[in-house]
């Protein structure tokens, strides 16, 4: 498509940006950064990488997708992220050249409207980063707990896990039944699609409540309809349970929690 567009315009495609999440919140998949960087260099695009769900999470030292996939951070023009995820504070970050960072800073809400977040929250982000830098065992434990959770749920034939193996954010969907196979027809009928989505949510709600009654909190992934209907016509748009592995639990505690989630799923769906 890009080749055709460039040939038709007979000149380089300028002012084009590739914008992507590193770890996608919607389905837990991880983007293949080396391929995107290759595409960026080939067409001379600029790139913005959102590391909200990967900074402080992915990589041996928590430095995100560039570390996990061994990509030079200088190959990414702008790296941004939300500090409310792994760092449990507020605000965000922008990593780039001095010129770009300065532009972002002077055009940010905190500068334009003098609405900076409390100093305590900013300091909390710094402390969180220092803690992660000082204790790399956190990442080892997170990877182990992610593996424990995934291995506990993967054998259940009634579900499918959409997330990448390295992702501690697991999205669990109901495996499509024979009645669901013709999804193209289902998507073409708004009423039938809405009814199908509601029935899926109801089943997931039962699993959610069973786990909660046994002391494990999981949640259904909130779904906001897209302004373009075709964007809701893929595996990522189907209702799912959102389950997050955490380094705050010991491996034994993670196994116990995973067993409860597995038992809740099997109780509702069967093995």
Name the predicted role of every residue range.
Residues 31-38, 78, 99, 144, ...:
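Alpha-helical scaffolding segments of alpha/beta enzyme cores, especially the outer helices
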Residues 22-27, 54-56, 111-112, 227:
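Short, small-residue-enriched loops and turns at beta-alpha junctions
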Residues 1-48:
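Active-site phosphate-binding strand-loop segment of PLP-dependent enzymes
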Residues 112, 212-217, 261-270:
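A common structural junction motif
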Residues 140-150, 158-217, 221-223, 228-241, ...:
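Conserved PLP-binding catalytic core of the aspartate aminotransferase-like
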Residues 43-46, 53, 58-167, 172-179, ...:
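Active-site C-terminal subdomain of aminotransferase-like
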